[in-house]
């Protein structure tokens, strides 16, 4: 026993020496068997723990792979002492094992239970966390590698032992670990091996391949100083997502052949163009905003980065082709024009809607509509009875056409203008009128050139003829055709002066010789009487005599029983159809005059724009004849007092005081005679008849009626009037407010209170009427006389005749010496009517005893 006790301290001394000499390469070395002599081992000698050389008992050997010593066999216990990691011996405190001071008593192999017990005890100690080869013991012990608090090498925190991981739980102490067997794996620095000898599972540590190099502190084995790109997996079977084709330094910015990843550059295959950022106004975009939103946008066609992009320039160019929509054109039209403006040139009646596309269509439609009959007219008039369709047939409405007293016929008659302020189409009307005038002037109730009896005004007839009242045969026929194109104006004069005072001047006043018949039977226009009668039948104009209201003579003013009277007459053939509507033009112009006037009127349609009142479109504002005065008087004649051109008002331009706008068209028409027609609703003047109190008007009647001017003066006045009429026929009003007499021409008119005591007598044609007055103004009519003066009682074209009466002159001959023969022709204006062949009327002119077809007029 003494030998044993002497040897026991040697391992402790050796351990101390080893602690001073040994320097482990890495902390946490491989736990090895406890070197050193064991009871029964070979003492002394230098050895390396784990090498199995010396210091161990006979059974000591090398460490196995992984640093685990071979498990001691049961047979090693006893003879040679415990094997590596054996249990403590009998010596107190000197035994090798897990429990200091030899927890298990016994000496050497004398462990209770023998070899089997020793093996079981070792196994239990191993599970308990005891190191294999620990030298020290529990805290306070002296063994190496003991539990915390021990002085052994590799102990737990607080221990002085070498090799243990600080803070490790149950780290394996010991001095071993110097020797490295073949195939041994050196674990990386980190947490020590846990209980049971299994390595820790900390990511990035000790797991090569998953995170080469790791992002944790420390250096990697393959990629020193470089971590793994976040989110980029590596390993077998995984395609590298690093740009540039991989390689040892792929993904390292600035290192390797391709450098690091660039924003917007696709990786891998198939390569897809990346989505460019922005689209809402960033500096560089594809230039296309979503949903067509128009905004600042970027510069189309410039990709981001290094030139890799969608190259949207082409797409952007196409998109720009359509661009963002504007605000639209003008509201309501969308590029089609200004919303709803008023039509053409407002106020220009004659030209319907000039300048507008709708006007052309409207004019065309109106022309066609007028062909079959137009609606009622504009100018307010009496409740005249119209022919079916468009008022009185005939166009006469244009100033100048039928303008001269006596030239008018079934012209402008009653309401007939189509619709609104504009005429249907003056062009069509003028054209129709021109053709109508070709066949002859309107006959009718013009101022009688020569009358021999009562009713001398109407026409030229000798005696009380039964011809057409206020309508020439040829004119009626032409008017019937002309009416095809549209209705005439409203409020025209029905036979201006003709029949104005039936029997008053001619016949009634002896100064004017003749009994004056109504144009028709026995008139200079007899040649066309039959044809006219036929035409008038179609046009609604019947032959008649027409009288003054309650009238006495033939061919008088409204209210008469005859045919052809002024509106209000009973018989057909009047101006306004058959009723009491506004009068027509009446009169007995010449064919040539009417033709020329119609031609002039065609031009006038563009200038007859003045005055949009109740008158005919484009003419005066009143109810008068188009282009004439605004009042109810005879167009262009006096405003109150008198017969056209003789009253005190604004007479015919050149005759009276004023000029009516829109009469430019009448300039040429006036060349052949003044315009006819009475105008306003109900006839010539205001309520009660033709003139105002005091008779027909101011001055006397040319033709040696009392107060008449001398021939020279009359000629000069007529000449001047013709030129003056060029500027328009103006003046408002007619014969006066109260008609011819106090109560008209009837019981209170020409009779007791009419032309007699208070009419043509003391206060009528005498002192204040045709007697003392001055008739046609010599000065005003100076130039008009060239073609024939116009005026009531002045006998168209007549000159003063010494001793009374009217001198014969061309167109109104009383004998075969003058064209027209018989009772005179149509030659108003000094032009004889055109011959139709043969020796008609003594010298081959129409009129003068010829009636109907016997006149020899050509038949179309």
Curated annotation (Swiss-Prot):
Q: Residue span of the signal peptide, if any?
A: 1-27
Give the transmembrane region(s). Answer: none
Positions of modified residues (Allysine): 123, 127, 299, 318, 321, 368, 371, 431, 435, 438, 481, 484, 534, 595, 599, 603, 668, 671, 719, 723, 783, 786
User: What's a GO biological-process term for it?
Assistant: outflow tract morphogenesis
Q: What are the disulfide bonds?
A: 850-855
- Modification sites for Hydroxyproline: 84, 383, 410, 415
Q: Which Gene Ontology molecular function entries are recorded, alphabetically?
A: extracellular matrix binding; extracellular matrix constituent conferring elasticity
Q: Where in the cell is it found?
A: Secreted, Extracellular space, Extracellular matrix
Keywords in alphabetical order? Disulfide bond, Extracellular matrix, Hydroxylation, Repeat, Secreted, Signal
Q: Provide the positions where the record notes the PTM 4-hydroxyproline.
A: 35, 72, 105, 217, 230, 233, 253, 346, 399, 405, 498, 519, 617, 626, 644, 653, 661, 702, 832
Keyword Secreted found: yes
Record carries keyword Secreted: yes
Sorted alphabetically, which InterPro entries does this protein's record hold?
Tropoelastin
User: Domain of life, per the record?
Assistant: Eukaryota
Q: What does this protein do?
A: Major structural protein of tissues such as aorta and nuchal ligament, which must expand rapidly and recover completely. Molecular determinant of the late arterial morphogenesis, stabilizing arterial structure by regulating proliferation and organization of vascular smooth muscle.
How it assembles, according to the record, is: The polymeric elastin chains are cross-linked together into an extensible 3D network. Forms a ternary complex with BGN and MFAP2. Interacts with MFAP2 via divalent cations (calcium > magnesium > manganese) in a dose-dependent and saturating manner. Interacts with FBLN5 and FBN1. Forms a ternary complex with FBN1 and FBLN2 or FBLN5. Interacts with MFAP4 in a Ca (2+)-dependent manner; this interaction promotes ELN self-assembly. Interacts with EFEMP2 with moderate affinity.
Protein's recorded name: Elastin
Native organism: Mus musculus (Mouse)
Which classification does the entry list for the species? Answer: Eukaryota, Metazoa, Chordata, Craniata, Vertebrata
């Amino acid at each position: 026993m003494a030998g044993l006790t002497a040897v026991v301290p040697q391992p402790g001394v050796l351990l101390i020496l080893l602690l001073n000499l040994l320097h482990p390469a890495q902390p946490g070395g491989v736990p090895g068997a406890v070197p050193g002599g064991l009871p029964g081992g070979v003492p002394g000698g230098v050895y390396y723990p784990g090498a199995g050389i010396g210091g161990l008992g006979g059974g000591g050997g090398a460490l196995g792979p992984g640093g685990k010593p071979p498990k001691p066999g049961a047979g090693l216990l006893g003879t040679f002492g415990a094997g590596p990691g054996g249990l403590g011996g009998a010596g107190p405190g000197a035994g090798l094992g897990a429990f200091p001071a030899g927890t298990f008593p016994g000496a050497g192999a004398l462990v209770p239970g023998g070899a089997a017990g020793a093996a079981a005890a070792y196994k239990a100690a191993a599970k308990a966390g005891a190191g294999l080869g620990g030298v020290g013991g529990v805290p306070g012990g002296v063994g190496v590698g003991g539990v915390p608090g021990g002085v052994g090498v590799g102990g737990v925190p607080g221990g002085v032992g070498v090799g243990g991981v600080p803070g490790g739980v149950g780290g394996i102490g010991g001095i071993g670990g110097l020797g490295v067997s073949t195939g041994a794996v050196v674990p990386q620095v980190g947490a020590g091996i846990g209980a049971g000898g299994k390595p820790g599972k900390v990511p990035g540590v000790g797991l090569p391949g998953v995170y080469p190099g790791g992002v944790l502190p420390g250096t990697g084995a393959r990629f020193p100083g470089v971590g793994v790109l976040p989110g980029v997996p590596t390993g077998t079977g995984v395609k590298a997502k690093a740009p540039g084709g991989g390689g040892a330094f792929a993904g390292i910015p600035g290192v390797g052949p391709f450098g690091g990843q660039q924003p917007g550059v696709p990786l891998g295959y198939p390569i897809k163009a990346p989505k460019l950022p922005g689209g809402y106004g960033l500096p560089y975009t594809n230039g296309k905003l979503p949903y067509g939103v128009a905004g600042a946008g970027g510069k189309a066609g410039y990709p981001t980065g290094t030139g890799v992009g969608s190259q949207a320039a082409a797409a952007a160019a196409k998109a720009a082709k359509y661009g963002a929509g504007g605000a639209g054109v003008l509201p309501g039209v969308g590029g089609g024009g200004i919303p709803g403006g008023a039509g053409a040139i407002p106020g220009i009646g004659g030209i319907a809607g000039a300048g507008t596309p709708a006007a052309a269509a409207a004019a065309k439609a109106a022309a066609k509509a007028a062909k079959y009959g137009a609606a009622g007219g504009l100018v307010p008039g009496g409740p005249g009875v119209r022919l079916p369709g468009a008022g009185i047939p005939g166009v006469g409405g244009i100033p100048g056409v039928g303008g001269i007293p006596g030239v008018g016929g079934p012209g402008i008659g009653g309401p007939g203008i189509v619709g609104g302020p504009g005429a249907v189409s003056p062009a069509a009307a003028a054209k129709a009128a021109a053709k109508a005038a070709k066949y002859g002037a309107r006959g009718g109730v013009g101022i009688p050139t020569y009358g021999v009896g009562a009713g001398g005004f109407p026409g030229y007839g000798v005696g009380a003829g039964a011809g057409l009242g206020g309508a020439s045969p040829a004119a009626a026929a032409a008017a019937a055709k002309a009416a095809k194109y549209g209705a005439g104006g409203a409020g025209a004069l029905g036979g201006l002066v003709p029949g104005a005072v039936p029997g008053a001047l001619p016949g009634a006043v002896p100064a004017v010789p003749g009994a004056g018949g109504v144009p028709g039977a026995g008139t200079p226009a007899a040649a066309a009487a039959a044809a006219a009668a036929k035409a008038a039948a179609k046009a609604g104009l019947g032959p008649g005599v027409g009288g003054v209201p309650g009238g006495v003579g033939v061919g008088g003013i409204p209210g008469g029983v005859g045919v052809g009277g002024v509106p209000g007459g009973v018989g057909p053939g009047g101006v306004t159809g058959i009723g009491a509507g506004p009068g027509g033009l009446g009169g007995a112009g010449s064919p040539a005059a009417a033709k020329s006037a119609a031609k002039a009127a065609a031009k006038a349609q563009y200038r007859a724009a003045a005055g949009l009142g109740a008158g005919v479109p484009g003419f005066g504002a009143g109810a008068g004849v188009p282009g004439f005065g605004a009042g109810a008087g005879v167009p262009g004649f006096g405003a109150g007092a008198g017969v056209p051109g003789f009253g005190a008002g604004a007479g015919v331009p050149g005759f009276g005081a004023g000029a009516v706008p829109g009469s430019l068209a009448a300039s040429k028409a006036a060349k052949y005679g003044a315009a006819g027609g009475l105008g306003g609703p109900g006839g010539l003047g205001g309520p009660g008849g033709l003139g105002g109190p005091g008779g027909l008007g101011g001055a006397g009647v040319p033709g040696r009626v009392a107060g008449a001017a001398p021939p020279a003066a009359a000629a000069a006045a007529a000449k001047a009037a013709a030129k003056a009429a060029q500027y328009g026929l103006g003046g408002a009003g007619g014969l006066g407010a109260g008609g011819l007499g106090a109560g008209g021409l009837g019981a209170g008119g020409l009779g007791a209170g009419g032309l007699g005591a208070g009419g043509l007598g003391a206060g009528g044609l005498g002192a204040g009427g045709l007697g003392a007055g001055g008739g046609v103004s010599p000065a005003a009519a100076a130039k008009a006389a060239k073609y024939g003066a116009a005026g009531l009682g002045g006998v168209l074209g007549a000159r003063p005749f010494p001793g009374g009466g009217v001198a014969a002159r061309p167109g109104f001959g009383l004998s075969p010496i003058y064209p027209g023969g018989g009772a005179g022709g149509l030659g108003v204006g000094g032009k004889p009517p055109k011959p139709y062949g043969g020796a008609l009327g003594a010298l081959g002119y129409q009129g003068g005893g010829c009636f109907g077809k016997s006149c020899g007029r050509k038949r179309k």
